[in-house]
């Protein structure tokens, strides 16, 4: 749904992250299987990407599949993997056409060889695009992310490239999967749930949080606008005083 908005362009978040929640409940309300909700959630992804590109957000990170989601029923996991491949096959050329870069964040080694190959192709095709960076967090968990960053730094210490005293928050940040990207300014979670679910724990240290009651497949430009308006009305202090 398109809506007329009037944001303060000087106060737009650079990096917005969204926990896309509520597909299963949305499907249940329709009397359908959970996979029906996931399929319709793709439309909300398109809307969110369009909105972010339209209003100058530089990085959009979407939580698509957590490392804990492997514990879901095998049929649902299989359907999600099929949907992932289908989305890459149909959407990447459109992203490239609109100058949008695609990154897949997470441990890709558990994916099938064909999916890993398609991910590499998609990231390579869009690598030099500059309008918007779209991060899809898939088989991602923040504990994994921070652990892997720690391993990278420990290996550098072991090889004598750095000393323990050289390790700073900035070096940890650069070892995370988000690397040189800006920290998250605004974290949105849909469906009314109010928890972080092991998502970008380091990156959201000073993020503003917005919890929407809208189920993800119904999340549209109006819903996104409400989150941006709320963000622009807040005073970010980053630990300082008023």
UniProtKB/Swiss-Prot annotation:
Entry keyword set: Cell shape, Cell wall biogenesis/degradation, Magnesium, Metal-binding, Peptidoglycan synthesis, Transferase
PROSITE patterns reported in the protein's UniProt record: UPP_SYNTHASE (PS01066)
Enzyme class: transferase
One Gene Ontology term, aspect cellular component: cytosol
Cofactors required: Mg(2+)
Family that this chain belongs to: Belongs to the UPP synthase family.
Name this polypeptide is given: Ditrans,polycis-undecaprenyl-diphosphate synthase ((2E,6E)-farnesyl-diphosphate specific)
Lineage: Bacteria, Pseudomonadati, Pseudomonadota, Gammaproteobacteria, Pasteurellales
Gene behind the chain: uppS
């Amino acid at each position: 749904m398109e809506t007329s908005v009037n944001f303060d362009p000087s106060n737009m978040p650079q990096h917005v992250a969204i926990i896309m929640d509520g597909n299963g409940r949305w499907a249940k309300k329709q009397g359908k299987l959970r996979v029906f909700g996931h399929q319709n959630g793709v439309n909300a992804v398109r809307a969110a990407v369009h909105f972010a590109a339209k209003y100058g957000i530089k990085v959009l990170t979407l939580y698509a599949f957590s490392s804990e989601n492997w514990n879901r029923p095998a049929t649902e996991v299989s359907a999600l993997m099929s949907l992932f491949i289908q989305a890459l096959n149909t959407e990447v050329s459109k992203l490239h056409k609109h100058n949008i870069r695609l990154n897949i964040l997470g441990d890709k080694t558990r994916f099938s060889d064909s999916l890993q190959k398609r991910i590499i192709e998609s990231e390579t095709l869009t690598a030099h695009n500059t309008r918007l960076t779209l991060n899809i967090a898939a088989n991602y968990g923040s504990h994994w992310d921070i652990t892997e960053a720690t391993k990278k730094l420990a290996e550098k210490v072991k090889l004598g490239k750095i000393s323990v005293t050289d390790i700073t928050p900035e070096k940890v940040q650069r070892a995370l999967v988000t690397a040189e990207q800006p920290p998250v300014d605004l974290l949105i979670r849909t469906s009314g749930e109010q928890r972080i679910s092991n998502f970008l724990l380091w990156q959201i240290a000073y993020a503003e949080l917005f919890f929407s009651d809208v189920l993800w497949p119904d999340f549209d430009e109006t819903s996104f606008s409400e989150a941006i308006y709320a963000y622009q009305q807040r005073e970010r202090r980053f630990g300082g005083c008023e």
